[in-house]
């Protein structure tokens, strides 16, 4: 999309969704075609600048602004390239490769959060008031640092939401602002709708019970429990799914719909070895 990085990235993700649908329908050729198109996000990545950059209609790069990727509405709407550039949910390994590898990407992602204000209100870095970044705290899980997902989701839950009038950090926007909180406070959230994977993070509550609808689920309830939960205990030390040790930082949608229980042991310090499988 000439001039628009945000739309180019969203179209690439949409093509990936279509490839998944086509695969499920048995349309192999269409699935392969749309999967290949979903890799088009790389065409708006400028290796010289080390980040996504809009192109002109003739394929040349648009002039790079003095503020760089922090320039408001340069190649996107109501945001900047630093915020929009993390939207490759369907190919995070490929995105990280473009950005210089996992270690460099992780450092840049950490910088993205460390420079934002404590209330996460409108700013040039992680801006929770604007929904395009809502999946970004969970990218730490995908990059091999789940303790940072745990830290930042707890910080956002505490800093961007208040139990008062105007308690949301931004416009509700069709329920997304509240939906993010509900899922994150329960301890799981999707990064890539179209996948059945949910990223795990630290629940806010000692116990949550989800009643399942028997029209769609095999189970009746999915229970989330924590041991050692406290305001400062934002780090997962270990987890169990239906009584068995869980070493992954994610679960599948079917784990919820089958019913059962997931439990977390929490502490005020990170466990750098949990969730790396």
Named regions from a protein language model:
Residues 253-277:
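C-terminal beta-strand-rich structural cap/linker in extracellular carbohydrate-active enzymes
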């Amino acid at each position: 999309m000439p001039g628009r990085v945000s739309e180019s990235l969203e179209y690439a993700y949409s093509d990936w969704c279509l490839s998944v649908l086509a695969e499920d329908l048995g349309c192999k050729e269409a699935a392969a075609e749309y999967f290949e198109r979903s890799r088009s996000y790389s065409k708006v990545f400028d290796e010289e600048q080390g980040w996504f950059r809009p192109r002109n209609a003739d394929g040349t790069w648009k002039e790079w602004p003095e503020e760089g990727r922090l320039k408001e509405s340069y190649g996107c709407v109501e945001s900047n390239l630093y915020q929009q550039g993390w939207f490759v949910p369907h190919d995070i390994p490929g995105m990280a490769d473009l950005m210089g590898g996992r270690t460099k990407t992780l450092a840049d992602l950490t910088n993205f959060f460390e420079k934002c204000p404590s209330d996460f209100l409108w700013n040039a870095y992680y801006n929770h008031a604007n929904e395009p970044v809502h999946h970004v705290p969970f990218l730490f899980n995908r990059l091999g640092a789940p303790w940072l997902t745990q830290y930042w989701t707890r910080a956002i839950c505490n800093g961007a939401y208040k139990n008062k009038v105007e308690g949301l950090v931004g416009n509700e926007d069709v329920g997304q602002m509240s939906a993010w909180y509900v899922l994150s406070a329960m301890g799981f959230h999707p990064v890539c709708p179209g996948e059945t994977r949910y990223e795990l993070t630290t629940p806010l509550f000692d116990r949550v019970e989800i009643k399942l609808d028997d029209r769609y689920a095999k189970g009746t309830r999915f229970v989330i429990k924590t041991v050692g939960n406290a305001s400062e205990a934002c780090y997962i030390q270990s987890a169990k799914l239906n009584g068995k040790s869980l070493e992954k930082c994610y679960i599948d949608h079917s784990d919820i719909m089958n019913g059962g229980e997931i439990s977390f042991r929490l502490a005020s310090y990170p466990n750098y070895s949990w969730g790396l499988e």
